[in-house]
């Protein structure tokens, strides 16, 4: 069944339903949708189906194999052994009567299963019997056309039978295999360290994931490679030039080479750095890894594939393989010889690295996961090149805070120097010479002098692959450890106790959690927890950048529990904005029933609190030795931290967690200075939006968790990279290539410091920008109060200017704001900085303005309209109010709920009063509300079906709250920082949301469109840095109105009706509707 080249989510689901229902394979041609390949693979794997990389240029989706590998081998061997037709019929009869355990499909099936799984198995058995005695040519011919030969366990079974046939031992009884399997599992269990395979059992570091994992699940085999070959370092660039020796200064003496500023190391050259005998021993073992089976023709002049290969570990993130992060095929098959010959070489190279570049080495040692270390070095991977004169290129995917190590290990040749264009130097390398260098710089080999004669040059580049530290690899690793725990029945025994998640690998730092908590921790949270604990165990910190709604608070509480699970008392300091302190308290109480209990959990928002003062007094007594010492968790408002530290002299937390940690990135932040005084290096930053206004924020965040990064990537260099990206975002198309290069570098650089998950497995999000019109009265007020004859007269607006937002709400709201009517709504409570700014602006406006007779007449007219029941005419004075009422009527008809965010007290109050007039039941959360009142309001909103919407402040309600009872989000006004609005949307669009979420961004033709331009530029920057995309802001004139292309019939009707609704003065209530996703244009650069 062929499928179009571009596959939407709906189409893909339909294809999977067809395959699952009928048992018929489906073929997809991926040539034009390579960016969607990971999505296809993930969906197919999630439903237990299989992928094969044929036909050429395509992928075949097959139904799950309904039988284990052992059972399949038994049937195939018995069928092949049969000598008569009757014996084969007996085997077929046995298969037909077999009890196949079919998985319940996760898909919603249109009908019952329409095929017999026995027929599927018989097809496999017959295929293997036909090929068991075939020649190699016949077998390879079949491999090119038979998808079943590309999947496991079929591939393994056929290969095993062919090997047995060729050796004359075809009739080995199946029970022998089972006995061997049981004995191997028992041996591993007795060793106590299931994680180490035979090849790594000597404690030299770096365990073999795939070899041991195959014993756990035969259907999850690391050898399965759906491309038919291991796609390593796929060079897709255009063919580039070769370098000539005459254009460079040839370096023959050891030395260190810096950039022009003298701050940044580009290369370190060492003559005779490694003994020749060590090099030559290594060459004997790994030279054969260099083959022409690769995709690097572009860096070999574009003519043929060079002789090159990979030894060690690799991240096959772009391959449709079941295992992404694992050893290469050569490593698996030749490990014993690699161990004997390469270990001394790599250990010597590792020592040399630590001595010559200690800062780079330290950062690389912190970054590399233990299970990917080759012989306990800082190298995960070796690229072996034989007679390979590389053209100019940069190496992608290397650890950017470290250096790669190039060494010639064997050969007879002249020339072929390694030249670095930016340095203008070519380094002469003979056997034993070493060059540590920055592989992000353009480099290549000069000509070979004796090319016409017999020459040989074998070199190896040793480095750390960034992808091995990715969240994909971390999640794979976590799944593997969990399987090992299930195998040892540790999870079953721990449901009522505390368990160490890393118990099966003693080389990993322990992660202690209540057994019951594992039931609710998502795979992403467990992977992030493993990442954090690994970094903390090495005396370093990290940034946890999970998109909103993925559970950063629960993750942090679990981290605190594990960190404090020690006989020695430890203290944790959590800094959280005042508006989310109640959320922390609520989460702590919520998870107590799962065993997440803390003896002392002290929360303070900075206000006078008797309970807080009592807690501080007792803690001081513990520090002074008057009471027994116990562990404490302090959750403090950052604005109050200075006062707390003054009261707690001698307070030394062993872990600092900063929630909404982007605040630490502010220039000249006093908070950073105060935290530095605590002398705690274990620092964790939580942020769904680590990049908000500029790329330098991310640089400062990472610099705070590890200041060493500044020495390997100076601020000036990072600023230049960020500036290149900004040029492209702001419309300079000529900067695209440079921007992509800068993005890639920053992405690779941040990988080892930031655990980032920006995508979620949630229902669809439909996000719209609705351009609302102005009534003639609003336009006149615009002219009278802002001195403009038209809306197009303003091209900029100050962030402190609040009057336009109240005008776009409604003329009556505007008059109330500038005359001070809403002042009384603020009460006497302490205001947030935003509310204080609004109040100051309001007071300033009221000092300059008194209501005129026309204003008073308008107020009387508005009140008359309301009192007379002419509500449509009343809201018709404002485009936004007209749109809001129509949207809420539509939501109420569907018996759904909405949350409405606005920055301004005046707008919130006006909306609330208007909704009451329309009999639309709503609730409101104010900044001054106490925790208990806020909790009751939220609970009532969730449970009371009569309540249609909840009104709250963008600044207060955008953090920490869970409103998944609502699936509509209305953003009443726009704010300069788009991540504040992203936080607001995440109150509804988060874990536990089961329905599609619709976002309505109500934008006036005046102030909102100006703010949106700034928002979109910042959003493009965020996508550039946090996602592998070249993103830029789309000019407003290029945006397309989506009313007529809207797929949802209900929304299409709503948009059209709003366009046909007219305001006072005759302007339409809505002029255009855009999809928010269309405002940023992105291209994948991976």
UniProtKB/Swiss-Prot annotation:
Domain Helicase ATP-binding: 533-708
GO molecular function terms attached to this record: ATP binding; ATP hydrolysis activity; DNA binding; DNA translocase activity; helicase activity; metal ion binding; thymine dioxygenase activity
Annotated protein name in UniProt: Bifunctional helicase and thymine dioxygenase JBP2
Protein residues bound to 2-oxoglutarate: 457
Chain spans, region Disordered: 187-220
Keywords: ATP-binding, Dioxygenase, DNA-binding, Helicase, Hydrolase, Iron, Metal-binding, Nucleotide-binding, Nucleus, Oxidoreductase
Location of the region described as Thymine dioxygenase in the Swiss-Prot/TrEMBL record: 1-518
Residues binding ATP, per UniProt: 546-553
Source species, domain of life: Eukaryota
Family assignment from sequence similarity: In the C-terminal section; belongs to the SNF2/RAD54 helicase family. In the N-terminal section; belongs to the TET family. JBP2 subfamily.
Cofactor names: Fe(2+)
Cellular localisation: Nucleus
Provenance organism: Trypanosoma cruzi (strain CL Brener)
One Pfam family hit: Tet_JBP
Cellular component per GO, a single term: nucleus
Task of the protein: Dioxygenase that catalyzes the first step of DNA base J (beta-d-glucosyl-HOMedU) biosynthesis by converting thymine to 5-hydroxymethyluracil (HOMedU). DNA base J is a hypermodified thymidine residue found in the genome of kinetoplastid parasites, which is localized primarily to repetitive DNA, namely the telomeres, and is implicated in the regulation of antigenic variation. Probably also acts as a DNA helicase. Recognizes and binds specific regions of the genome, hydrolyzes ATP and allows the DNA base J de novo synthesis.
Cofactor note: Binds 1 Fe(2+) ion per subunit.
Gene Ontology BP, a term: double-strand break repair via homologous recombination
Main location: nucleus
Record motif DEAH box, residues: 659-662
Domain spans labelled Helicase C-terminal: 883-1041
Residues bound to Fe cation: 393, 395, 443
Chain positions covered by the region annotation DNA Helicase: 519-1084
InterPro entries the record matches: 2OGFeDO_JBP1/TET_oxygenase_dom, Helicase_ATP-bd, Helicase_C-like, P-loop_NTPase, SNF2-like_sf, SNF2/RAD54-like_C, SNF2_N, SNF2_RAD54_helicase_repair
Reactions catalysed, as given in the entry: ATP + H2O = ADP + phosphate + H(+); thymine + 2-oxoglutarate + O2 = 5-hydroxymethyluracil + succinate + CO2
């Amino acid at each position: 069944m062929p499928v179009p080249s571009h596959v939407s989510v709906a189409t893909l689901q339909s294809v999977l339903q067809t395959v699952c229902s009928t048992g018929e394979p489906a073929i997809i041609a991926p040539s034009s949708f390579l960016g969607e390949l990971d999505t296809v693979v993930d969906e197919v794997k999630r439903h237990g189906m299989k992928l094969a990389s044929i036909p050429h240029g395509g992928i075949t989706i097959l139904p799950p194999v309904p039988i284990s590998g052992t059972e399949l081998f038994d049937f195939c061997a018995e069928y092949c052994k049969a000598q008569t037709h009757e014996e084969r019929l007996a085997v077929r009869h046995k298969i037909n009567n077999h009890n196949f355990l079919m998985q319940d499909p996760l898909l919603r099936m249109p009908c019952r299963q329409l095929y017999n799984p026995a027929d599927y198995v018989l097809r496999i058995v017959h295929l293997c019997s036909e090929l068991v005695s075939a020649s190699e040519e016949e077998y390879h011919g079949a491999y090119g056309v038979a998808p079943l030969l590309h999947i496991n366990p079929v591939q393994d079974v056929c290969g095993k039978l062919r090997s047995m046939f060729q050796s004359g031992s075809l009739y080995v009884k199946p029970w022998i295999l089972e006995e061997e399997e049981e004995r191997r599992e028992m041996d591993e269990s007795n060793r106590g360290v299931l994680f180490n395979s035979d090849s790594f059992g000597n404690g030299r570091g770096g365990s073999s994931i795939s070899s041991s994992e195959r014993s756990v699940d035969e259907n999850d085999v690391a050898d399965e490679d759906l491309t038919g070959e291991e796609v390593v370092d796929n060079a897709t660039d255009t063919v580039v030039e070769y370098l000539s020796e005459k254009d460079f200064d040839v370096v023959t003496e050891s030395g260190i080479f810096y950039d022009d500023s003298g701050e940044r190391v580009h290369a370190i050259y060492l003559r005779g750095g490694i003994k020749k005998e060590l090099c030559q021993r290594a060459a004997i073992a790994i030279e054969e890894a260099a083959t022409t089976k690769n995709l690097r023709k572009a860096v070999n002049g574009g003519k043929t594939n060079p002789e090159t290969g990979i030894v060690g570990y690799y991240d096959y993130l772009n391959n449709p393989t079941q295992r992404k992060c694992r050893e290469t095929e050569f490593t698996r098959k030749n490990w014993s010889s690699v161990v004997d010959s390469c270990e001394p070489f790599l250990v010597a190279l590792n020592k040399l690295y630590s001595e010559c570049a200690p800062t780079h080495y330290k950062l690389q040692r912190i970054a590399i996961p233990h299970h990917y270390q080759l012989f306990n070095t800082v190298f995960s991977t070796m690229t072996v090149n034989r007679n390979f004169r590389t053209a100019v290129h940069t190496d992608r995917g290397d650890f950017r805070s470290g250096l790669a190590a190039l060494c010639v290990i064997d050969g007879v040749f002249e020339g072929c120097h390694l030249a670095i264009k930016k340095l203008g130097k070519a380094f002469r390398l003979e056997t034993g010479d070493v060059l540590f260098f920055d592989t992000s710089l353009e480099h290549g080999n000069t000509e070979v002098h004796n090319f016409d004669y017999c020459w040989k040059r074998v070199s190896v580049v040793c480095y750390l692959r960034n992808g091995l530290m990715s969240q994909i690899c971390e999640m794979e690793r976590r799944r593997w450890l969990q399987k090992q725990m299930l195998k040892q029945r540790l999870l079953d025994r721990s449901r009522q106790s505390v368990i160490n998640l890393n118990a099966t690998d003693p080389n990993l730092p322990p992660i202690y959690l209540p057994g019951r908590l594992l039931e609710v921790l998502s795979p992403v949270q467990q992977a992030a927890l493993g990442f954090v604990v690994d970094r903390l165990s090495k005396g370093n910190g990290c940034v946890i950048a999970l998109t909103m709604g993925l559970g950063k608070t629960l993750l942090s509480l679990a981290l605190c529990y594990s960190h404090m699970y020690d006989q020695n008392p430890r203290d944790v300091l959590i800094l959280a904005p005042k508006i989310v302190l109640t959320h922390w308290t609520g989460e702590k109480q919520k998870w107590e029933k799962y065993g997440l209990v803390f003896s002392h959990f002290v929360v303070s928002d900075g206000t006078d609190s008797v309970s807080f003062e009592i807690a501080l007094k007792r803690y001081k007594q513990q520090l002074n030795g008057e009471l027994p010492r116990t562990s404490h968790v302090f959750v403090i408002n950052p604005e109050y931290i200075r006062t707390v530290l003054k009261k707690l002299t001698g307070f030394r937390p062993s872990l600092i967690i900063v929630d909404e940690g982007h605040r630490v990135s502010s220039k000249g932040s006093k908070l950073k200075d105060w935290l530095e005084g605590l002398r705690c290096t274990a620092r964790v930053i939580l942020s769904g939006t680590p990049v908000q206004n500029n790329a330098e924020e991310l640089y400062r965040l990472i610099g705070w968790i590890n200041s060493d990064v500044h020495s390997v990537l100076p601020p000036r260099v990072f600023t230049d990279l960020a500036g290149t990206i900004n040029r492209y975002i702001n419309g300079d198309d000529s900067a695209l290539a440079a921007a992509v290069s800068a993005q890639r570098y920053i992405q690779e650089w941040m990988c080892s410091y930031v655990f980032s998950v920006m995508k979620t497995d949630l229902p669809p999000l439909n996000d719209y920008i609705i351009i609302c019109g102005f009534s003639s009265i609003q336009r006149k007020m615009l002219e009278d109060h802002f001195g403009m004859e038209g809306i197009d007269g303003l091209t900029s607006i100050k962030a402190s200017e609040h009057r336009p937002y109240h005008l776009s709400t409604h003329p009556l709201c505007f008059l109330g704001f500038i005359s001070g009517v809403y002042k009384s709504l603020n009460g006497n409570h302490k205001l947030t900085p935003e509310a204080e700014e609004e109040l100051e602006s309001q007071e300033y406006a009221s000092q300059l303005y008194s209501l005129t007779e026309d204003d008073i007449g308008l107020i009387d007219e508005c009140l008359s309209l309301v009192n007379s029941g002419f509500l449509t005419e009343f809201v018709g004075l404002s485009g936004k109010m007209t749109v809001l009422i129509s949207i809420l009527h539509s939501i109420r008809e569907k018996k759904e709920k909405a949350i409405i965010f606005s920055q301004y007290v005046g707008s919130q109050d006006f909306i609330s009063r208007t909704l009451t007039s329309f009999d639309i039941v709503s609730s409101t959360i104010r900044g001054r509300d106490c925790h208990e009142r806020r909790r009751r309001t939220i609970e009532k909103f969730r449970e009371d079906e009569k309540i249609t919407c909840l009104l709250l402040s963008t600044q207060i309600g955008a953090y920490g709250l869970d409103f998944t009872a609502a699936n509509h989000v209305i953003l009443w006004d726009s704010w300069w920082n788009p991540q504040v609005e992203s936080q607001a949307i995440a109150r509804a669009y988060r874990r536990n949301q089961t329905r599609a979420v619709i976002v309505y961004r109500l934008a006036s033709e005046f102030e909102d469109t100006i703010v949106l331009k700034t928002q979109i530029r910042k959003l493009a920057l965020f996508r550039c840095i946090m996602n592998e995309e070249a993103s830029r802001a789309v000019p407003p004139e290029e945006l397309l109105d989506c009313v007529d292309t809207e797929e949802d019939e209900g929304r299409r009707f709503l948009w059209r009706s709003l366009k046909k609704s007219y305001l006072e003065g005759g302007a339409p209530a809505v002029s255009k509707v855009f999809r928010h996703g269309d405002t940023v244009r992105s291209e994948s650069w991976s």
